[in-house]
């Protein structure tokens, strides 16, 4: 049995969100397994109403990760994203001749779990296997601040 590092995971939970679970699942399936920054970019550009509450949850999970655990947001990956059915909000709509029709508004519960990939043991083993880590020193190939250093376009 593989032990999971529980210290490497942070979650955000949104309950009783007024939308169909089926419609929310369509959006959640697009971001599951992606990095935090890539998921935010996808959610900003998708034209669905379900994107905004999910965007807020992903952002909240990253804020929890950086504040509570001290994770770097750029190193976070959405390891688990699930949508469950919630209760139906029932309303009565008045109709002619004193009748009323029942309106059911579906709700859902959304859970987003972020994982820091640098605290995951399998990822560290994979990095060692392909030569990215030498003697417990990590070789970083990413450019963190691409546009902040000035560059050619800032000069007159």
From Swiss-Prot:
Keywords: Chloroplast, Plastid, Ribonucleoprotein, Ribosomal protein, RNA-binding, rRNA-binding. Signal peptide: none annotated. One of its GO terms (biological process) is translation. The keyword Hydrolase does not apply. Gene3D superfamilies: Ribosomal protein L22/L17. GO terms for molecular function: rRNA binding; structural constituent of ribosome. SUPFAM superfamilies: Ribosomal protein L22. One of its GO terms (cellular component) is large ribosomal subunit. Transmembrane segments: none annotated. It is found in: Plastid, Chloroplast. NCBIfam families: rplV_bact. Belongs to the universal ribosomal protein uL22 family. This protein binds specifically to 23S rRNA. HAMAP family: Ribosomal_uL22_B. Part of the 50S ribosomal subunit. This is Large ribosomal subunit protein uL22c. It comes from Buxus microphylla. The lineage of its organism: Eukaryota, Viridiplantae, Streptophyta, Embryophyta, Tracheophyta.
């Amino acid at each position: 049995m593989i032990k999971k590092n529980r210290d490497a995971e942070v979650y955000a939970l949104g309950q009783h969100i007024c939308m169909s679970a089926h419609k929310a699942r369509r959006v959640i399936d697009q971001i599951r397994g992606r990095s935090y920054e890539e998921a935010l970019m996808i959610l900003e550009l998708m034209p669905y109403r379900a994107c905004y509450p999910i965007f807020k949850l992903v952002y909240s999970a990253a804020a929890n990760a950086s504040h509570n655990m001290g994770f770097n947001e750029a190193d976070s990956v959405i390891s688990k994203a699930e949508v469950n059915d919630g209760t139906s909000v029932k309303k009565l709509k008045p109709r002619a001749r004193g009748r009323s029709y029942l309106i059911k508004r579906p709700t859902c519960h959304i859970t987003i779990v972020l994982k820091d990939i640098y605290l995951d043991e399998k990822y560290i083993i994979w990095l060692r296997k392909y030569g990215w880590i030498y003697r417990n020193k990590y070789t970083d190939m990413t450019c963190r601040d691409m546009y902040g250093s000035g560059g050619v376009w800032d000069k007159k």
